[in-house]
UniProtKB/Swiss-Prot annotation:
Disulfide bonds: none annotated. It is found in: Cytoplasm. HAMAP family: Arg_tRNA_synth (MF_00123). One of its GO terms (cellular component) is cytoplasm. This is Arginine--tRNA ligase. The keyword Protein biosynthesis applies. Keywords: Aminoacyl-tRNA synthetase, ATP-binding, Cytoplasm, Ligase, Nucleotide-binding, Protein biosynthesis. It comes from Syntrophotalea carbinolica (strain DSM 2380 / NBRC 103641 / GraBd1) (Pelobacter carbinolicus). The keyword Heme does not apply. A motif ('HIGH' region) lies at residues 129-139. PROSITE patterns: AA_TRNA_LIGASE_I. Belongs to the class-I aminoacyl-tRNA synthetase family. InterPro entries: aa-tRNA-synth_I_CS, Arg-tRNA-ligase, Arg-tRNA-synth_N, Arg-tRNA-synth_N_sf, ArgRS_core, DALR_anticod-bd, Rossmann-like_a/b/a_fold, tRNAsynth_Ia_anticodon-bd.
Length: 554
């Protein structure tokens, strides 16, 4: 709708230039907003005010010239008014609005998909949990956020890759191996004083028991280094497989799994440091090699190579992000836990040091999740190794509720996840409320079939039969969906789609509760059936976009 309106305004401006009524010769960006009050029209533009300086005229005079050149817009609007200092307000005709329904029917599952991204390549890297333990609910929120960000970008016309970065280098894998080895020896009857810096969870004991069952006691006398390597590899492989299974149960699939160790195996870390050295961005102090990140806004410089010769995690992050852009991505998005917020400036510095625009790297921070049961917070303590896993929550409330609830707030705000509410089979449950709207339309369709009311085809509906205010309001809301998708993609905010779904479901339920869709007048029945099935299409498209099902019966 906005696109059509912009086209008419642009044509009117060009006509004004051609007829020497306006003289700047440049059409500015035409912003269209929905006024806060309905009496001010359906859309409003400030284009006249934007042109005032270049035209050296009062905005109202410019607005009068534009309005005179607009004509009737092919029946798109009933009237156009000038308000305040020079706003141009458009009042669209109901017939224009109801044309949106034909577009929904014409595009079907593709309605809401746009070409805004124009095929630009974007990588979204998310979850990337260490393969040292199962995924917890914090990882789950990151998974839902990253997957939904990738989905809305894809719907907006970007070429998207989903990547999981496997942190399989460094001390954490050795710590996992040691934890598993010690639990294995405990199971063999040895008395072990388990170190506090080892992984404490029950899952480590379970893995050790698996090793004992499959390998017996033969690993007891292995040399320490060989034993650690075996248990680290065994534990890492098993946990990685478990992570993959949990993500599959959550409906998340990655296009690429990228190993941190591979950066070392291919000397990418060395090459990354060498490049920074060549550019004069490093220096030596206290036997260590430092990157001058303060040159690019960081609060202090960062170590790349420690005085003992060991590289830092930051060094591998430099190499990893360098390699990402070498793969041809225009934009790279990292989804991190909010506790990594202090890491953002140094990664922006990396891009500047690599002669990339720091804005080519976008970082989405995901805040904590508070699980609630019976109104009380569920205890979670990673120190003791006992924590609520993502799989436990999926098993308790289901994938749909899990994904929807994780996306109900901005990712950078804390989230209270009410387990009791998520399990309710009632309209109190936000995801049930939205899915029920879809199921209700499907029920109407079954009733229509039973009554012999055929589903109208494109062009077979008399929109003059849609006379209720709620019918026009629903149609206006449907027209907004492509814009919601574009906004969610532009700002990396998939919660906008959730908010939209809740608004659309509420509007539909209100319409449904006020009267019948199928009435004695067949033309009215067919028009209403056409409308509610457009609602069903948009509900389906938006739910699927978020990885949530759209059930036909509930």
């Amino acid at each position: 709708m906005k696109q059509r309106l912009r086209q008419y305004i642009g044509e009117a401006l060009q006509a004004c230039f051609d007829q020497q009524q306006l003289h700047s010769g440049t059409i500015p960006e035409i912003n269209l907003e929905v006024p806060a009050h309905a009496e001010h029209g359906d859309f409003s533009t400030n284009v006249a005010m934007a042109m005032a300086r270049a035209e050296k005229k009062a905005p109202r005079k410019i607005a009068e010239t534009i309005v005179a050149a607009l004509g009737e817009g092919g029946g798109m609007w009933s009237r156009v008014e000038i308000a305040g200092p020079g706003f141009i307000n458009f009042y669209l005709t109901p017939r224009c609005w109801f044309g949106v329904l034909d577009e929904v029917v014409r595009r079907g599952d593709l309605f809401g998909r746009t070409h805004t991204g124009n095929g630009r390549k974007v990588q979204v890297e998310f979850v990337s949990a260490n393969p040292t333990g199962p995924l917890h609910i914090g990882h789950g929120r990151g998974a839902a956020t990253g997957d939904a960000v990738a989905a809305v970008l894809g719907a907006a016309g970007y070429e998207v890759q989903r990547e999981y970065y496997i942190n399989d280098a460094g001390n954490q894998m050795l710590t996992l191996g040691r934890s598993l080895l010690l639990r294995y020896r405990e199971l063999l009857g040895e008395t072990i004083e388990f170190p506090t810096d080892c992984y404490q969870g029950v899952y480590v004991i379970d893995l050790a028991r698996e090793v004992l069952e499959s390998e017996g006691e033969r690993l007891r006398d292995l040399p320490e280094e060989e034993a650690l390597r075996f248990f680290a590899n065994y534990g890492g492989d098993k946990i990685r497989a478990g992570i993959d299974e949990d993500l599959a149960a959550f409906g998340v699939r990655f296009d690429n799994w990228y190993s941190e160790q591979s950066l070392y195996d291919r000397q990418e870390v060395e090459r990354g440091i060498a490049l920074l050295k060549e550019r004069g961005l490093t220096y030596e102090k206290d036997g260590a090699i430092w990157f001058r990140t303060t040159d690019y806004g960081d609060d202090k410089d960062r170590v790349l190579i420690r005085s003992n010769g060991a590289t830092t995690y930051f060094a591998s992050d430099v190499a990893y992000h360098k390699e990402k852009f070498e793969r041809g991505f225009d934009t790279v998005i990292d989804v991190w836990g909010a506790d990594h917020h202090g890491y953002v400036p140094r990664m922006k510095a990396v891009l500047a040091g690599l002669d990339r625009n720091p804005e080519d790297l976008q970082i989405i921070l995901v805040q904590l999740v508070n699980l609630l049961r019976g109104g009380q917070q569920v205890a979670m303590s990673t120190r003791s190794g006992e924590f609520v896993t993502l799989r436990e929550v999926i098993d308790e409330v289901g994938r749909d509720a899990c994904r929807f609830f994780f996306l109900m707030r901005r990712s950078d705000s804390q989230l209270d996840f009410d387990l009791d509410l998520a399990k309710k089979q009632s309209t109190e449950n936000p995801v049930y409320y939205v899915q029920y709207a879809h199921a209700r339309v499907c029920s109407i369709n079954r009733n229509a079939e039973d009554q012999g009311v055929a589903m109208p085809e494109l062009g077979e509906v008399d929109f003059d039969c849609l006379t209720l205010e709620d019918e026009l309001a629903l149609t206006k809301l449907l027209s907004r969906y492509p814009e919601v998708v574009d906004g969610a993609a532009e700002h990396f905010e998939p919660h906008r789609v959730v908010f939209y779904l809740q608004e659309l479901a509420a509007r539909f339920h209100s319409y449904y509760n006020k009267g019948r869709v199928l009435v004695d007048d067949p033309d009215v029945s067919r028009a209403r059936l056409y409308l509610v099935n457009c609602v069903r299409t948009v509900l389906h498209n938006a739910l699927v976009l978020l990885g949530v099902s759209a059930p036909e019966r509930m």
